[in-house]
Amino acid sequence: MNGTMTSYCLALLGGYLLGSIPFGLILTRLSGAGDIRKIGSGNIGATNVLRTGRKGLAATTLLLDGGKGAAAALLAVHLGGWALALPAGIAAVIGHLFPVWLGFRGGKGVATGLGVLLATAWPVGLICCALWFAVARTIKISSAAALCAFAFAPLLALAVGGMGLGPPPLAQSHWQAAAAFMLIAVLVFLRHADNIARLRAGTESRIGTRS
């Protein structure tokens, strides 16, 4: 196996393992809040952690879940250049969705996906974060805000990258970045299938709802 292939495989493996760290579960257990998988929706992400009533814990989960997506992409850059950033970032999202440590039952990839966007295409990431915040603040439904943000990510990659802005994955290969963001968006949408059904039925829970 040559050096390039070795670096690629290490980036994918490292991204997956980093993404699979269940920070929400770890933090709730360490804080005495219990097993987050038995609280609220059972999801290990920040929105469900917020249902414990501990805002600081939810914020920390959000930052760590986003951080591991960004870290996976940026560490891959040091390993083998920007060409490895997007594959490693996607691997991190997959790791969060299907963590080996939890029987491949993980979160929904929103914070981790946004972390990847911020690391590989910060203008797109910032716009998507702002879009998530605006929608969430307006209608108080986290899932709808997330779906809206990721739906626009591929289009934003084409628009912003087409102007030559952002890090190399965006400025130099905006079509590839758009394709990668489309894949992340598809994964996020698939993991939100139940949420989408509840949104259509008008029964989706709102941000801050206690378990």
From Swiss-Prot:
Presence of keyword Ligase: no
Pathway annotation: Lipid metabolism; phospholipid metabolism
Entry GO terms, CC: plasma membrane
EC annotation from Swiss-Prot or TrEMBL: 2.3.1.275
Pfam families named in the record: G3P_acyltransf (PF02660)
GO molecular function annotations of the record: acyl-phosphate glycerol-3-phosphate acyltransferase activity
Keyword Cell membrane attached: yes
The name this protein goes by in its record: Glycerol-3-phosphate acyltransferase
Organism in which the protein naturally occurs: Granulibacter bethesdensis (strain ATCC BAA-1260 / CGDNIH1)
